[in-house]
Curated annotation (Swiss-Prot):
One of its GO terms (cellular component) is nucleus. The keyword Transmembrane helix does not apply. Residues 30-39, 47-63 have a biased composition (Acidic residues). The gene is GATA17. Residues 100-135 form the Tify domain. This is GATA transcription factor 17. InterPro entries: CCT_domain, TIFY-like, Tify_dom, Znf_GATA, Znf_NHR/GATA. Keywords: Activator, DNA-binding, Metal-binding, Nucleus, Transcription, Transcription regulation, Zinc, Zinc-finger. Belongs to the type IV zinc-finger family. Class C subfamily. One of its GO terms (biological process) is regulation of DNA-templated transcription. It comes from Oryza sativa subsp. japonica. Induction: By drought and salt stresses. One of its GO terms (molecular function) is sequence-specific DNA binding.
Length: 328
């Protein structure tokens, strides 16, 4: 039992020993990466400064008036500035050039026996200057970028594009796609039209309207056209009586002014059509011709007209027009 309770001596756990030899290369790699990042940042800042300087010079040129030159004139101007007859961007110590060894982004100019050296000049900037002088481009082997000329041409066309855009906007302001209601024209038309108690009336006078009564095929005058109402029927659609034999034509199921006075009142009050009473037919009597009194020169009227008027009164009484005429 005592063997189970014996305590083992404490042995602390020890971690692996630090590798000094491996830490040194890691630190060196970190320092190299940091230096590379610093150099990259400095290079990026320099490039940004160069681009800003180029944009500033281009804006100054756009503000002034540039006189374009042809290729021959620009070549002669450049040849006059350089004793060797050309502008040489030096990329290193060239054989026979006589120039010291400089960096690849350095521009060297000679004018009147004096040499000018410009530091940090890119090939794009040199080509832009040559294009301003008259359209001369760099040689293919001088490190020029083809896309730079296109980018510069876009910048040169920018003022023209802005001018055209401003003209388009001015024209667009004058356009109005909404419908304009010309109240002045409507007012002129309304003033020319004739009115009767505030309502527009026909341009014809009352005398002309009275004389222009339209007669239907049956021979009944169309009085509704004079009053501005729809034309009335020549006869009642229910009982068949003529429009001239009734005091007025009234509204019916077929429309306005389609029933006689009696049928129209029945339809308006009760909503039904009245029963038409058919009386016995009246026999026609043959009356001898009228006799002429040659001595007195007086023509005696026959009883035909009186008989016809009596027949019409009998028909009207049978249809009930005499009893309804007072109600109308």
């Amino acid at each position: 039992m005592s063997g189970h309770h014996e305590a083992k001596p404490y042995q602390p756990r020890r971690g692996p020993a630090p590798a000094d030899e491996e830490a040194a290369p890691a630190a060196a790699a970190d320092e190299a990466e940091a230096e590379a990042e610093v150099e990259a940042m400095e290079r990026y800042e320099q490039e940004q400064e160069y681009e800003e300087g180029e944009e500033g010079e281009e804006e100054e040129y756009e503000g002034g008036e540039g006189v374009p030159m042809d290729a021959d004139a620009s070549a002669a101007a450049v040849a006059g500035m350089d004793p060797h007859g050309e502008m040489v961007p030096v990329a290193g110590g060239e054989a026979g050039g006589g120039y010291p060894h400089v960096a690849s982004n350095t521009l060297t100019l000679s004018f009147q026996g004096e040499v000018y050296v410009f530091e940090s000049v890119s090939a794009e900037r040199v080509q832009a200057v040559l294009l301003l002088l008259g359209g001369r481009e760099l040689a293919p082997g001088s490190g020029s970028v083809p896309s730079s000329s296109a980018a510069y041409s876009k910048k040169m066309n920018f003022p023209h594009r802005m001018a055209s855009l401003m003209r388009f906007r001015e024209k667009r302001k004058e356009r109005n796609f909404d419908k304009k209601i010309r109240y002045t024209v409507r007012k002129e038309v309304a003033l020319r039209m004739q009115r009767n108690r505030g309502q527009f009336t026909s341009s014809k006078s009352k005398a002309e309207e009275a004389t222009s009564v339209i007669t239907s095929s049956e021979g009944s005058p169309n009085w509704g056209a004079v009053e501005g109402r729809p034309p009335s029927a020549a006869e009642c659609h229910h009982c068949g009586i003529s429009a001239a034999s009734t005091p007025m034509m009234r509204r019916g199921p077929d429309g306005p002014r389609t029933l006689c006075n009696a049928c129209g009142l029945m339809w308006a009050n009760k909503g039904t059509m009245r029963e038409v009473t058919k009386g016995p037919p009246v026999p026609l009597q043959i009356v001898p011709a009228a006799t002429n009194d040659v001595q007195n020169g007086i023509v005696e009227a026959t009883g035909v007209e009186q008989h016809n008027s009596a027949v019409e009164e009998a028909v009207s009484a049978a249809n009930g027009h005499e009893s309804q005429s007072g109600v109308a």
